[in-house]
A protein has these predicted regions:
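Surface-exposed short loop/turn segments
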Residues: 24-27, 86-142, 152-163
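Bacterial N-terminal signal peptides that target proteins for export
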Residues: 1-8
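Short secondary-structure boundary motifs at beta->alpha junctions and helix caps
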Residues: 58-65, 140-182, 186
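A structural "domain/chain start" motif
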Residues: 19-77, 178-197
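Alpha-helix N-cap and loop-to-helix initiation/capping positions
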Residues: 67-71, 120, 164
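Bacterial N-terminal signal peptides
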Residues: 8-15
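Generic beta-structure capping elements
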Residues: 50-52, 106, 148-151
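A short, N-terminal amphipathic alpha-helix
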Residues: 75-85
Length: 197
């Protein structure tokens, strides 16, 4: 019985620490909308997708690397599948023009399923800021660098035992694909996902 009481005290202590600890970095995009690319993306014949990476202090942390792997799977399912379709089409330029897509997670606070089970909503909210660097392979010119923000509120994460936390990674992958599609024939940019809250 004493062991269970001790575990309960430890779990509650961890929960309160997580609940009231301040993030080292504020996780949010520069604004509510991404600017359009410097040229129409339909001007490229081929797409080369680089593996997603974590930047700065977020790299090398086990929970963040787990989130990165989940994001990569969802990115491959969405953007990767679309790129395969585009690359199967005949090229309109000779030589073919290639757009390099470099996804990265700039900032993240990811609450694992285990933390949700132990601490629930006390573990806090998950947040992620993803960026896409779109580069003309031939010239090295950066065509666009949109960013996408999503979060999973603490209570949503608790009620779903972490499903909501993982869903934010799916949404950022979907937003990445939406940007690539929306800016093919007209340069319109796209929302960042930030609602000012």
């Amino acid at each position: 019985m004493r062991m269970w009481k001790w575990l309960a005290v430890v779990a509650l202590s961890m929960a309160w620490t997580l609940a009231f600890a301040k993030d080292k970095d504020e996780i949010k995009p520069a604004g509510t909308s991404n600017p359009p690319p410097s040229e129409l993306l339909s001007g490229f014949d081929r797409y080369e997708v680089k593996p997603a990476v974590l930047t700065g202090v977020y790299a090398g942390q086990e929970i963040n690397e787990t989130a990165l792997a989940s994001f990569q799977r969802n990115f491959d399912e969405r953007v990767g599948a679309w790129v395969a379709e585009q690359n199967a089409r005949p090229a309109r330029h000779d030589p073919a023009r290639t757009l390099v897509i470099e996804p990265r997670i700039d900032k993240i606070r990811f609450i694992s399923g285990g933390a949700r089970v132990w601490a629930g909503a006390f573990a806090g909210s998950s947040r992620v800021l993803v960026a896409l660097r779109l580069v003309d392979q031939a010239t090295g010119e950066v065509i666009a660098e949109p960013e996408f923000y999503q979060h999973a509120k603490a209570m949503a994460g608790a009620w779903t035992f972490g499903v909501a936390d993982n869903n934010m990674l799916i949404r950022t992958a979907t937003m990445s694909l939406d940007y690539l599609k929306a800016n093919q024939d007209q340069a319109v940019g796209a929302p960042t996902g930030w609602e000012g809250k």
